[in-house]
Design a protein with these regions (language model features):
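Single, function-defining residue in the core of a domain
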Residues: 1-260
């Protein structure tokens, strides 16, 4: 019988390299916004934060803006605001481009400056979906705001890749420390596989790479050389099993039995 185990990984993923820059692994009871400060502590002036609406904490976002950091996040549905300016755009997929100010009792004091609000039609899994974003950058085109948020979805691909190739859905232990250690080991294994992919110039899928390394890890071979040659004429030959090894003595085929 499988037991239930829950762990939450908060991660800052570099969209350009698809590599984790910072991670926090903890039990699933904490809300995402509680770890936002730790995740973004290493961001610098001019960096761009792309995050889900779970990280919409206006005091936190105001702190980012004060540090010169830009952000693009999904709007919370219950956000209370007034429209200061509305801009028209010829792009039919841009439905709204507004300058707004928060007026909610719990939000107006936390972020007193104007915000950018963009509503756009975005393709999600092959289907058009209307989405609304908030940002503190007024220089970007509204299409850029929408496309930047789409880039955030690489983290979904990252976790899908992590779960599928390293089998993080099943745990050996189920207490808090056991689950945390297994997630950390999975992240480290993923990092090592990405390093192997880079140095070997691996051109096939990541799942194929994980499968090859998994099958070769106990073999005495030059792993990098094997990965570089994999799928080519110079690749490692498959081991050949001698036919005689498949039979007990006295039960060999007649062609294999000793004469005399």
């Amino acid at each position: 019988r499988r037991k239930k185990a829950a762990a939450k990984t908060h991660m800052r993923l570099n969209v350009g390299t698809m590599l984790p820059a910072f991670a926090v692994v903890e039990d699933a009871a904490h809300h995402d916004s509680k770890r936002a400060d730790a995740l973004c502590a290493g961001l610098k002036d001019g960096d761009v934060l792309l995050a889900d609406r779970a990280y919409v904490d206006f005091l936190f976002l105001h702190g980012l803006a004060a540090r010169g950091i830009f952000f693009v996040l999904r709007e919370k549905e219950n956000m209370d605001f007034e429209v200061l300016e509305e801009r028209q755009h010829p792009d039919r997929r841009i439905l709204k481009d507004q300058t707004i100010r928060l007026r909610g009792k719990l939000t107006a004091d936390k972020y007193p400056e104007p915000l950018r609000r963009v509503t756009a039609v975005v393709e999600v899994d092959g289907r058009d979906t209307e989405m609304t974003f908030i940002s503190n950058n007024f220089a970007w085109s509204p299409r850029t705001v929408a496309e930047l948020y789409r880039a955030r979805w690489v983290i979904e691909s990252f976790f899908k890749e992590l779960k599928q190739t390293l089998q993080l859905a099943d745990f050996v232990g189920y207490n808090e420390n056991a689950v945390k250690w297994q997630v950390w080991v999975g992240l480290l294994a993923h990092l090592l596989l990405r390093f192997l992919k880079h140095v070997s110039k691996w051109g096939l899928s990541f799942s194929r790479l994980a499968g090859v390394v998994r099958s070769a890890v106990w073999m005495k071979i030059d792993l990098l050389d094997a990965l570089r040659k994999y799928g080519t004429a110079g690749g490692p030959k498959r081991p050949v099993i001698v036919e005689k090894q498949l039979y007990f003595q006295g039960f060999e085929p007649f062609s294999s039995r000793p004469v005399g």
